[in-house]
């Protein structure tokens, strides 16, 4: 059983969360800038949720033995996972509506004036595509479905860490 719990060790877990999130962000930026797939506004929100996972992983990695850092990281991962589930689920619904000839999507993000990410980094945070348009699939499933699966997986892994990984460090 201890071999199964080893990945939940704080020294491995939080860096893996951060690196995994960075790899996902690198992949979607590759799809956008190399393959030419324009992100929609919900895609941008999903990017922010993945960025939340990265930040949670960094916080947890900075002080792997600190209960405070671990608690903040766990709350960050929980918030990012729940936000990601909400946004990915919304995008799956948009894709289904678009397949029926309906759906709507806003082309502006509405970031607060004090942190206008779409102005500061438009190449990353500026929506340019339509939400219901499926431009990439893997095994017959859209990126929205895979994003939903990723965030559900993150939530389950966090639950396992909190339930079983208390003293694995």
From Swiss-Prot:
Major site of localization recorded for this protein: membrane
Record's subcellular location: Cell inner membrane
One Gene Ontology term from the biological process aspect of the record: protein folding
Sorted UniProt keywords: Cell inner membrane, Cell membrane, Chaperone, Disulfide bond, Electron transport, Membrane, Oxidoreductase, Redox-active center, Transmembrane, Transmembrane helix, Transport
Record field: transmembrane: 14-30, 49-64, 72-89, 146-164
Membrane-related topology note: Multi-pass membrane protein
Entry superkingdom: Bacteria
Gene Ontology CC terms, in alphabetical order: plasma membrane
Disulfide bond residue pairs: 40-43, 105-131
SUPFAM superfamilies noted in UniProt: DsbB-like
Periplasmic side of membrane: 31-48, 90-145
Molecular-function GO term, any one: protein-disulfide reductase activity
Membrane topology (Cytoplasmic): 1-13, 65-71, 165-169
Function: Required for disulfide bond formation in some periplasmic proteins. Acts by oxidizing the DsbA protein.
Similarity comment text for this entry: Belongs to the DsbB family.
Record protein name field: Disulfide bond formation protein B 2
Organism encoding this protein: Pseudomonas aeruginosa (strain ATCC 15692 / DSM 22644 / CIP 104116 / JCM 14847 / LMG 12228 / 1C / PRS 101 / PAO1)
